Amino acid sequence: MRPPSLPPARWLCVLAGALACALGPAGSRAASPHQECEYLQMIEKQRQQCLEEAQLENETTGCSKMWDNLTCWPTTPWGQVVVLDCPLIFQLFSPIHGYNISRNCTEEGWSQLEPGPYHIACGLNDRASSMDEQQQTEFYDAVKTGYTIGYSLSLASLLVAMAILSLFRKLHCTRNYIHMHLFMSFILRATAVFIKDMALFNNGETDHCSEASVSCKAAVVFFQYCVMANFFWLLVEGLYLHTLLAVSFFSERKYFWGYILIGWGVPSVFIMIWTIVRIHFEDFGCWDTIINSSLWWIIKGPILISILVNFILFICIIRILVQKLRPPDIGKNDSSPYSRLAKSTLLLIPLFGVHYVMFAFFPDNFKAQVKMVFELVVGSFQGFVVAILYCFLNGEVQAELRRKWRRWHLQGVLGWSSKSQHPWGGSNGVSCSTQVSMLTRVSPSARRSSSFQAEVSLV
């Protein structure tokens, strides 16, 4: 005797909709139509495998293999109880430990599910009651509004910063070129978030469960590439500053192309590997969920390595700064070396991405709401902070803007006749690239001291 069951198609549709509403703590992605497709495709794959195995089995005196629309129950002799973990579909939203389901094989067939229906046996009632539907909706709307504002503000400020560093030729130097690539990585990351949201949460009438979801997969791949490139350009910032302070003589042009390869090339290699692996081993849905965690180490591993290297560089830079802040000839106007070290450290922490450590090492079972706020809302403002630190608070940028403002103020709106004599980037004084080249004419110790002063002046 088999327990009554709903028709498979109806069962699966009801389940997908119920889980998307009941398991809100999984994050805003729980409402994604593509994630519902992943659940349906996963269950369909398990169903086909179970039915194929059942057809190959011989008749037994016990209970034969059975598919109950969610779980495949193995062949079992009479009088035995089969205990299984809750289906993986319930664990996709958040790790659920300690919940099991069981059936007893009797002479009449399989018994009813114990300790009750799936939503009770797997603890969905407890999770759904922790936050009612209205509170969940308000929370997710607030999170989406928060990171939309953050990424929009970051995008606008980064575009302005890129324009400033591009238009003024006096600001063209290796250091600012690297800053511009870092800005671009944040711009692409913000753009990728908006594109991914459009692809994942499009409420149109498209058949999201069909194979015509290449655009959604491409959006997720682009998003993952932008995130990894963002980490690696933070690593490049650290490598450049460490080289500037620790190496007496080096070819900035040769090093710069190496930085380009690290910042944009290395992430593309790992993303291509990850894409190929997903196509062959996990090609269902929109690729925006973690089903096989081992595959995600192709992305997570290089990011964690870049964070580790940045942390090591951070310690080395702090050591160099302490040594360079002690000599009395570096600057006697500051109140104390420790105050300047504190200012430099505040600049280096976002530069080296140490703040990413807390995000990368959050445990999987950490409270989803708190993790979501940190990763989405707080992380969305990082581009804005970077633009403030490396452009708007840059002393050279401020001096150039003041000089241009004074020229515009004196000449007036129509006084551009002298523009041919004073082009956009033309200005008196030494450019930042000339400052670096002039360091080769002095001793290595004096060059390191001057380089250090140039970097600290950015604070």
Swiss-Prot record:
SMART domains: HormR. One of its GO terms (biological process) is G protein-coupled receptor signaling pathway, coupled to cyclic nucleotide second messenger. GO terms for cellular component: plasma membrane; receptor complex. Residues 31-142, 198-217, 278-293, 362-369 are extracellular. It comes from the Eukaryota. It is a multi-pass membrane protein. Glycans are attached at residues 58, 69, 100, 104, 292. Pfam families: 7tm_2, HRM. Residues 168-175, 243-255, 319-340, 394-459 are cytoplasmic. Its main location: membrane. Residues 1-30 form the signal peptide. It is found in: Cell membrane. PROSITE patterns: G_PROTEIN_RECEP_F2_1 (PS00649), G_PROTEIN_RECEP_F2_2 (PS00650), G_PROTEIN_RECEP_F2_3 (PS50227), G_PROTEIN_RECEP_F2_4 (PS50261). Disulfide bonds join 37-209, 50-72, 63-105, 86-122, 216-286. The chain crosses the membrane at residues 143-167, 176-197, 218-242, 256-277, 294-318, 341-361, 370-393. G protein-coupled receptor activated by the neuropeptides vasoactive intestinal peptide (VIP) and pituitary adenylate cyclase-activating polypeptide (ADCYAP1/PACAP). Binds VIP and both PACAP27 and PACAP38 bioactive peptides with the following order of ligand affinity VIP = PACAP27 > PACAP38. Ligand binding causes a conformation change that triggers signaling via guanine nucleotide-binding proteins (G proteins) and modulates the activity of downstream effectors. Activates cAMP-dependent pathway. Belongs to the G-protein coupled receptor 2 family. Interacts with ADCYAP1/PACAP; activated by both PACAP27 and PACAP38 neuropeptides. Interacts with VIP; the interaction results in VIPR1 activation. This is Vasoactive intestinal polypeptide receptor 1. It comes from Mus musculus.
